[in-house]
Amino acid sequence: MRRGNSGARGNRGGSRGKPGQNEHIPNFIKNKPWYLAEESEVSASTSAINSNSTISGTGTGTGTELEEKDYLSHHRLKKSSVPDSGTAEIDDAFTYVRPSGRNRKKKDSYDLDLDAPVRRRDEKVIESNYDAKRDRWYGYTPDIKEIERNHKGPDTSHREMDEVQIQEMERLGLKPEDVGFDATQPLSGPKEKYNPVRLREDKAAYLQDMSSEEMLYDPKSRIYKSKEEGTIDPKSKMFHRHLTGDALQVGVINERVRQEAVRSGIKDFEVNKEKLNHVFAANPTKYELMMRTEPERKQETSVEQDAAPKRRKFDKNSFKESSSSSNPGSSTMKDLYDKYM
């Protein structure tokens, strides 16, 4: 059984609730809102209703009877007194005007306050410019354009040749190809412009043996293992480059220093060629580890095979010869052998 104040929430039998009202209607609807007319106007409307009730023969009605008659009158929509105005009055408190389709004002292409044209989408600009498609306002400027605009001066100065550079090249007898410019581009204006062009034959090293079964390019060390570049050590399975350029001179200098050290009596200056050929791998790959462990496994298996006892294979002829030599006079062993073997 529910307990509580029986008069709360607009109960019919309670003191706070009004008789004849729905108890589920909240208080902010049942109570009179603040935006209604003044008490004088309400009293005038009640007197008019009372006069109408006396004419109809019902007699004068009290305030409770009026509330019981229509207690939600302040939320009812009433037609406006002006015909065909498209308005609706809410108990004369305020008037909301909803214009019809014919009377609605069309939007102008110009703003009346600022007198400026409205920005519209330009399909031609959007189709021609990819950056404009990224933004709903076609005035979008990406960051890359600002970067190119700021660095445009240094880029063009590198490609263009001024008069001082031309005179210096003529004095030294150099060509634009020697400096890194392309001479095939036609000259335009007082300044000679050359764009550096990469040769088509200049191909990446890892693309040279794509169709071959053996890959000569090492992605770890980024070395192309060709015979011209170096050799592969059969012991360590590592690639050793041939010494070229300054490395050859360094080797000659080291040899002279070693000879001078030996003459002066320094005996610790010894050279081990095996250590020089050794390559230290800071992070060996799985293939390198497998190549190192494979000979060790072969040695272990060979040692195990040598240590295991060998089993002799049975041979009929050898058995006959041994049996005849051990006991030549006995024929029973021979008969048994012929019978069961």
From Swiss-Prot:
It comes from the Eukaryota. InterPro entries: Slu7_dom, Splicing_factor_SLU7. One of its GO terms (biological process) is mRNA splicing, via spliceosome. It is found in: Nucleus. Residues 42-57, 320-331 have a biased composition (Low complexity). GO terms for cellular component: spliceosomal complex. The keyword Nucleus applies. Transmembrane segments: none annotated. Residues 292-301 have a biased composition (Basic and acidic residues). One of its GO terms (molecular function) is pre-mRNA 3'-splice site binding. Pfam families: Slu7. Keywords: mRNA processing, mRNA splicing, Nucleus, Spliceosome. Residues 1-90, 172-196, 292-341 are annotated as: Disordered. Disulfide bonds: none annotated. Associated with the spliceosome. Involved in pre-mRNA splicing. Belongs to the SLU7 family. PANTHER family: PRE-MRNA-SPLICING FACTOR SLU7, STEP II SPLICING FACTOR SLU7. This is Pre-mRNA-splicing factor SLU7. It comes from Kluyveromyces lactis (strain ATCC 8585 / CBS 2359 / DSM 70799 / NBRC 1267 / NRRL Y-1140 / WM37) (Yeast). The lineage of its organism: Eukaryota, Fungi, Dikarya, Ascomycota, Saccharomycotina. The gene is SLU7.
